[in-house]
């Protein structure tokens, strides 16, 4: 069943199948449309929002998308206990800008007292894992959030983080937010991360599933797209006609096909979607029915040749 999915650790055994959010979600629409989109997401049971302060490292762009979201969610009338907030902690200027400072800033900008979960972001070079794990635990102890995950971490560092948490009796990461979808599968389904998902040590939060819109036919996206790991973006754009053809065969939209593929993986807790219009949200929600109607095995069979990152390192190294 499409509804039989894992959660994000013991604190969140059930989460919505879809999570709204991306770099530019809330600053790509009129404010009233943002309010209506949030309200409709809650009505559909998808009141899970991935929201971050993007003003550090390669994301130093002075974005206001998080502030817009904070105002919009209040205007939509959602009580804080009725929606889930997934935040970000960045390692780009860590520990110069520590997690306490980052959380203070993020929570103030959104206008809430705490998040529910956070993702500790990706990085270049080496990081002080002992300090990262301890500092995350400090934020959990302070009530800033209840669980944490990692974003595209190198597998060796992730394993070290597990060991540190176990030895020190601290909270380990419970999910991984990974690039995952029709075209990019190597990391989530490869020999390194897949055993962690299979054992239940981690669950998967799928991100970048449409490659910035390329896999739903937007071949000239006007928004930022995540890193092109492996340099395969041109190949991904070239796969669009095949995606469209398979979706048509299933009497579904390309977006529904892409989301259903992610949810067909039993490790997937939920899928991040960067909708900026209510019509997109309504369409995306149809992915659940598609998966129930067609089945995971059939979807994977039909999309087998769309796996385009087979030669990309599965261990998180670039």
Language-model regions, residue ranges each:
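N-terminal binding-site loop/beta-alpha segment at the start of enzyme catalytic domains
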Residues: 1-81, 141
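Beta/alpha (TIM)-barrel catalytic core signal, keyed to glycine-rich beta->alpha loops juxtaposed to Asp/Glu
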Residues: 123-306, 310-313, 317-318
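Charged helix-capping and loop-helix junction motifs
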Residues: 33-36, 63-68, 100-102, 130-136, ...
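Active-site groove signature of glycoside hydrolases
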Residues: 108-126
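Conserved, mostly hydrophobic/aromatic
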Residues: 20, 34, 41, 49, ...
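Active-site mouth loops of central-metabolism enzymes
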Residues: 21-32, 87-97, 121-122, 126-127
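Acidic (Asp/Glu)-rich catalytic clusters
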Residues: 9-14, 42-43, 70-82, 104-113, ...
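Short, acidic/polar
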Residues: 29-41, 95-111, 129, 158-163
């Amino acid at each position: 069943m499409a509804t039989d999915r894992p959660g994000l650790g013991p604190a969140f055994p059930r989460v919505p199948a879809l999570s709204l959010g991306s770099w530019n979600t809330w600053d790509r629409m009129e404010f009233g449309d943002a309010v209506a989109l949030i309200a409709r997401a809650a009505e559909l049971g998808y009141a899970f929002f991935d929201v971050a302060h993007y003003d550090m490292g390669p994301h130093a762009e002075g974005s206001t998308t998080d502030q817009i979201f904070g105002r919009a969610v209040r205007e939509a009338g959602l009580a804080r206990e009725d929606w889930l907030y997934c935040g970000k902690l960045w390692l780009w200027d860590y520990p110069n800008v520590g997690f306490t400072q980052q959380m203070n800033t993020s929570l103030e900008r959104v206008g809430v007292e705490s998040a529910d979960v956070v993702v500790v972001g990706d990085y270049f070079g080496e990081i002080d894992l002992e300090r990262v794990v301890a500092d995350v635990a400090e934020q959990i102890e302070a009530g800033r959030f209840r669980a944490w995950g990692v974003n595209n971490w190198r597998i060796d560092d992730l394993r070290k983080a597990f060991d540190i948490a176990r030895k020190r009796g601290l909270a380990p990461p419970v999910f991984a937010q990974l690039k995952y979808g029709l075209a990019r599968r190597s990391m989530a389904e490869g020999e390194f991360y897949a055993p962690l998902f299979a054992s239940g040590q981690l669950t998967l939060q799928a991100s970048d599933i449409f490659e910035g819109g390329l896999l739903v036919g937007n071949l000239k996206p006007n928004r930022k797209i995540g890193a092109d790991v492996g340099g395969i973006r041109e190949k991904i754009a070239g796969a669009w006609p095949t995606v469209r053809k398979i979706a048509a065969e299933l009497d579904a939209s390309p977006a529904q096909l892409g989301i259903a593929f992610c949810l067909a993986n039993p490790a997937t807790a939920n899928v991040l979607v960067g909708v900026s219009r209510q019509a997109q949200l309504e369409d995306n929600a149809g992915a659940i029915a598609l998966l129930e109607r067609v089945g995971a095995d059939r979807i994977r069979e039909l999309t087998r040749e769309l796996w385009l990152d087979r030669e990309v390192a599965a261990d998180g190294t670039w």
